[in-house]
């Protein structure tokens, strides 16, 4: 095998991006020829490639005249990375046609393709008169536009003057590229169970099954959740199993409104009113449809440039924005939201080197909206709750938030029902150095279960401030119910003034309720104060404090919660010290816990280049004390196994004693496996009195036009990998996900309205499988099942030595298989590499435009070639 073809073969079996035309060896030789040709004296201005630089016999070299015109590649379809004005747009298959003598080959881009990249087609004279599928002569229709193909990088560089571009935010993906997915049915299953041996209370068994089914048709998504439970114990006669329907809903996106329509069971957001479950209809904004540079709150930057200038924006010392602006006033409204606060330092650098620097204060709270952005929701239906103590009144709710200039936001909403009416209005402000604040008030009229009517007001405020110099973040949330007559909507749905949120009678068995399940409308909430503070200590430590205090009308009982902790790392050893306190208004006493956790990875003691399996393991120690004398100590190891790290394990052992409980040893062991067809887990725990075995399996089933594919539990948005013939290929960046025996796999999650990269690991392909391209990009809508297709060539990898009239075929000749699925370029000695070839067939060869500059070679391979990594063959081309 020649060196050039050996390199050609290695590149096509190891590279992730497998190109349609394999050109490495060819262009090495061609580059040498170009270098000499450039030094040769010419009698005219035209460039001439002397074939004698490549071979002694000019007839041994294919027609290279196209390269004399600057044409580096023959016309055809190539997969390239498209960059517009130095910004990455997409990776796509682009058809290139023959251009004029100076252009070489030029890309065939349609009007729709250019529009999807941000070109304002209406601003280009005559472009809208072209048919949708006609190639746009970009450089002739737009003055100063350029199109250049970088063959070595397989990158298409386009430049279009800014005057012809639409004003789009960073990260914008045109809705035309959003993929609603395929029609398909899906089923998620999650089964778990345990068996308990209790030396005191006897044996018991429990099982639980959660089924989440769905159907996608076009842009519509139908979803349903149902559960089944089973339990039996020695303390009760017989066993009990129960099916329960949880919810069903139908939804779709409304793209022009950047909104989502939900029919059936859903829930409202808790930004203005308390979130509630409902059965009805909802139309609400979906900010996931916005580019990341338009989500969350960020100030709008205004400035003036004396000339063409470079604008750089920093936050907390990091560059978060960089752009070039034309002379005159400019506006920047596509800054990515970064944290809750941190002033923005804006630098305008002019062409002459002079700079302007100013600071824009920045702090945020959750309700703040960008200038000009509106978020809304409209809901109508009936109140829905799994609590038998609550009724199902019909209601209407609407909310609206709108961003104003100068960092202001106004918002409000209304809730209307037969026994409840509430109106809310509020304002928020980015106060810069003083932080961010939002204040709102709700006026409510309520009728309680005893038919008493109440009027009341609730005032809420939210404050956030970061002290960047000291690394301190303060978030203060305060609720103050100024009158005793304020109730929320859920309070009016109860059928009684007090009781428990669970059934206290199960047949003949009396169920003892928990104090957390108790409610009493006579003691409605009065005021609540929450405070969260985080403090950065050096580079590797963080201190956090969080607490809340809830008071009630008519009683001195209060709810209290407090958490404090210190997280730190010394080299790669992590440890956490934490404290928690919980006090319920109807609880006697309080619950406290002091805990210490230490994790030490085994890699701490291994060389950085160690291949030991222990590099994926860690040792752990934990101690907890309830401050009433009871302490638990646990020590153990955890980590992952197998090549894909898809088998995780954890083993812990320890001792618990003191306080009111029994003393004795305790411990547990677990195994969790994540595979291409689903997940499984098993575990065992023990103490002196109780032994427990628990287990579970979970996964997803996807039924589509090409069959049924099993996978891991499916999230809302998934990707179906279709690579027929490429069985057992690993999907990159996915633990345990491989294609099945047909070449299909399911990626259990994807990010909606964003470009998702899906790639197959070519190192895991069978020896007789090759891919045109191992990477696909998809942009799914929410809830979509999108298909990522890969074209696999299943067949023999063949290194052919072709001769014509007993001489090697010309260097640079194009070779195409009979099915046109594989092609290559002849290197030295008439050798060419082809993949996906059948045992018998023919190849077509062309090395010029003359009538006698082409031939056909037939070949026949032995059956054992199918088991060989590479087969070599010589054939005569006639």
Please state what every model-predicted region is.
Residues 2-11, 18-19, 27-297, 626-702:
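Post-signal-peptide, soluble extracytosolic/periplasmic N-terminal scaffold domains
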Residues 67-70, 83-84, 173-177, 300-308, ...:
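Structural motif
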Residues 162, 181-199, 220-232, 261-265, ...:
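Transmembrane beta-strand segments that form the barrel wall of outer-membrane beta-barrel proteins
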Residues 155-159, 366-369, 774-795, 859-878:
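Extracellular beta-sheet/turn segments enriched in Thr/Pro/Gly and aliphatic residues
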Residues 511-517, 522-818, 823, 827-833, ...:
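Exposed, low-structure sequence patches enriched in small/polar residues
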Residues 178-180, 205-218, 242-255, 392-406, ...:
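Feature captures outer-membrane beta-barrel proteins of Gram-negative bacteria and organelles
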Residues 118-120, 164, 761-775, 847-860:
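A short, solvent-exposed loop/turn motif at the edges and junctions
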Residues 111-116, 345-348, 669, 754-765, ...:
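A short, solvent-exposed beta-strand micro-motif common in secreted/extracellular proteins
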